Amino acid sequence: GSVRIFSSLMDIMSDEELLGVIGHEVGHVAHKDSKNGFRTALLTSALKDGISSQGGKAAALTESQLGDLGEALVNATYSQKQEREADDYGYEFLKKAGKNPWAMALSFQKLKQLQEEAGAQKSSKLNQLFSTHPDLDARIKRMEERATGEGIEKPENKAPEAAR
């Protein structure tokens, strides 16, 4: 697979924070999340088609918005689990590189700031991107608790230019 990072992140994140984001994305590749997600979507669609071919009330439900909602829930839950695993991968990626894993929480804080700046524009690319991701506050808290629990000191939050 390939990893893509928005170049604008380089303007707001330190090298360690960017490395954490890259580690997160590498985690998706290492865990074959795209392949597994595609397989889940195909199986869910096939199951839905199989039920609807039988006719009756079950078919009516699978063809309705309720069926679409069920399919979305299956895929969203899977996606949230993948995101947590990719977050953990990014955290470990930083540690293995000899970097401070607090960078995961700090990168999420900056992403949250970007999301807040996008505001109520539900159609913004950023809000669309994060609509399938776990809540950033929960992700920040989880990474902070992990680093604190491991006795890792939080670095001073430097401007990206000063950090390079």
Predicted regions located by residue number:
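A Zn2+-metalloprotease active-site environment signal
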Residues: 1-164
